[in-house]
Structures are given as structure tokens and as C-alpha cells.
């Protein structure tokens, strides 16, 4: 959402930007929207909680990962399977959508003693054979998305997964080097690919969650986020 509002984690010189108006607009809009129309307990809901709400017909709109499409369209698990539509994340009029790029990837540690076995597993788990195996057991709509380009040309998958083309379009449209409206020094759409982000991202997320829960104001949350980001960037040597 912040990208579509033109917000940045840092400017070109790694100066934190939570004190800028774009972040105020983003967080205020989010908090107001969720308080007015979001589910109860939204500040503590994660993927599984929101998935359950959507499948039960208690959440009218859910913006999340493309992998969730197969879950919400499965009539065995979802009460709204025949009522679900799919759309790209919104554009706030500045030329950037609020979508992101994320993947659960398979990697082989350089120091492993069983690299050959690991490589065989990775090759198998991303192979056409595995895709066909999952399809035979769980149905074409439930095969792992985003692992093989050929999947999106498969007529059986296209028929079973009405979200297939939109998923591929979303993947192709993601641009980790230009995530928001203004230039940034980092790579990453919904995260910043630097070591400091793991801790900083958690801190900022908790601050924003507290604002949604009514434990702090939007202004206070942004000030604390700015302070935390400034401290992290100073300690990391990005700024003085």
C-alpha cells in the first residue's frame, strides 16, 4: 500500500522517510479503513486468520499472495468459492500498484555435505513431474504457482485456475528495483534487501499494528518508526 501512496523506506541517501507526508497518508488511510470496515482483531490477524475469515464469507476483500487464490476457490474449503473474483492490487493514481513480490525459495547452503541430494530434491520439487503429481492428487488448481513458466501455458491449469493469467501478469509486472514512485537506493518491493531490515521491519510492523489496535496514534507510530530507522541506519553506517 505504501508504494502506491508514493512512500519510501529511505531516500537516495538512506535517510529514513517515515516523517514524510506520504507515510502519514498511507498509515492514516490504512488505520481508518480497517477500523471502519475491517474484521475484529485485525491488528493481530495473519495469513491464516484472514484466510479463514475469507473462506467463511466474513471478509469481503483480501489483498494477499497469489498462492491464496487456490485456497479461496476450493469448494471443499471455501464457502465463497463460486463467488470469488480476482484483481490486481489497487493503484492510487501515482503509477504504482500496491502489489508485492515474494517467494518461498529453495536454496542449498554452500557448506552442506549433501549438496548432490539437495540438488536432486530441488530439481524434483520444481519439475514438471512434480507439478503433474500434485495435479493428480490435489487437482490442477492446487499445484504450486510461480515455479514453472510452462504451467501458465497448460490448458488444464488455465481451465482449473481462473486466476492463472492474472498471477503471471502480476509476477511479470513486479519491479524490485523500482518499487515506489520516487527513486530508492534499495532493492525490494515490500522489503528492503539489507541485513538491518529483519529487525527494523519487525519493529515498524509492531508500531503500525499498535496504531491499528488504538494503543498509539498514527503520528506517534510514525515518529517511533522514524527514530528506530534512523538508529538502525546510523548503527549500520548508512548515515551519520
Give residue ranges: language-model regions.
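Short amphipathic alpha-helical coupling segments at ligand-binding clamshell hinges
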Residues: 22-29, 113-125, 220-224
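Alpha-to-beta junction loops
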Residues: 56-65
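Short, well-structured alpha-helical segments that form the helix of a local strand-helix-strand
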Residues: 54, 218-231
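Solvent-exposed, amphipathic alpha-helical segments
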Residues: 199-214
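C-terminal lobe and pocket-closing loops
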Residues: 67-81, 92-202, 240
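Glycine-centered hinge/linker elements that transmit conformational signals in sensory
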Residues: 13-44, 85, 89-90
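Extracytoplasmic/periplasmic solute-binding protein
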Residues: 1-16, 22-23, 59
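Short hydrophobic/charged patches on amphipathic alpha-helices used for structural packing
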Residues: 48-51, 55
Amino acid at each position: 500500500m505504501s508504494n502506491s501512496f508514493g512512500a519510501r523506506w529511505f531516500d537516495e541517501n538512506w535517510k529514513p522517510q517515515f516523517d514524510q507526508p506520504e507515510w502519514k497518508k498511507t498509515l492514516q488511510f490504512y488505520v481508518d479503513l480497517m477500523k471502519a470496515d475491517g474484521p475484529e482483531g485485525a491488528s493481530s490477524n495473519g495469513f491464516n486468520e484472514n484466510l479463514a475469515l475469507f473462506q467463511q464469507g466474513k471478509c469481503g476483500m483480501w489483498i494477499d499472495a497469489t498462492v491464496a487464490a487456490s485456497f479461496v476457490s476450493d469448494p471443499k474449503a471455501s464457502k465463497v468459492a463460486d463467488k470469488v473474483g480476482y484483481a490486481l492490487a489497487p493503484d492510487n493514481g501515482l503509477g504504482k500498484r500496491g502489489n508485492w513480490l515474494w517467494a518461498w525459495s529453495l536454496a542449498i547452503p554452500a557448506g552442506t555435505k549433501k549438496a548432490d541430494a539437495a540438488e536432486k530434491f530441488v530439481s524434483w520439487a520444481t519439475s514438471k513431474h512434480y507439478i503433474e503429481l500434485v495435479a493428480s492428487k490435489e487437482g490442477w488448481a492446487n499445484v504450486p504457482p510461480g515455479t514453472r513458466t510452462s504451467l501458465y501455458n497448460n490448458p488444464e491449469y488455465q481451465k482449473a485456475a481462473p486466476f492463472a493469467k492474472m498471477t503471471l501478469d502480476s509476477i511479470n509486472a513486479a519491479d524490485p528495483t523500482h518499487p515506489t514512485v520516487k527513486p530508492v537506493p534499495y532493492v525490494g518491493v515490500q522489503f528492503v534487501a539489507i541485513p538491518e531490515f529483519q529487525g527494523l521491519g519487525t519493529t515498524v510492523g509492531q508500531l503500525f499494528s499498535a496504531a491499528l489496535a488504538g494503543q498509539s496514534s498514527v503520528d506517534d507510530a510514525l515518529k517511533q518508526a522514524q527514530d528506530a530507522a534512523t538508529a538502525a541506519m546510523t548503527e549500520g553506517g548508512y548515515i551519520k
